[in-house]
């Protein structure tokens, strides 16, 4: 059986406080790969994308979280929902499919330390 390949949007979050993010669309993503393999791919791909400003290409991303799944409701958060971490944060040892990723899913790629700091004090600078 051929691996299932889908299109997903990865939102690169540079700053939670300043709501600084850039979406990048990936086509042909294999859902049978692990989250860890996908993170490694993203860490190799993002610095090579000349369409992204250098601050986004050179940032220390390390965590993935589901923002939105196709045909489901969206949150009111402008950057990323601070709720349901146990369900929406992707665990590195699971496959993308087992983690709930499907076609047209939007996921966030960010620095976990920045996320924890923002979650403890969710104040935007503008």
Curated annotation (Swiss-Prot):
Family: Belongs to the UPF0538 family.
Name under which the protein is recorded: UPF0538 protein C2orf76 homolog
Organism (species): Pongo abelii
């Amino acid at each position: 059986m051929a691996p299932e390949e889908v299109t997903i949007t990865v939102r690169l979050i540079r700053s939670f406080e300043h709501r600084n993010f850039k979406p990048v669309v990936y086509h042909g993503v294999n859902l049978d790969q692990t989250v860890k393999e996908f993170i490694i791919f993203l860490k190799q791909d993002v610095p090579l994308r000349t369409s992204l400003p250098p601050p986004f290409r050179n940032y220390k991303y390390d965590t993935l979280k589901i923002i939105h799944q196709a045909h489901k409701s969206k949150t009111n958060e402008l950057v990323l929902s601070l709720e349901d971490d146990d369900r929406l944060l992707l665990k590195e040892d699971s496959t993308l499919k087992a983690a709930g990723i499907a076609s047209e899913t939007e996921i966030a790629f960010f620095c976990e330390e920045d996320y924890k700091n923002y979650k403890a004090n969710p104040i935007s600078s503008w």
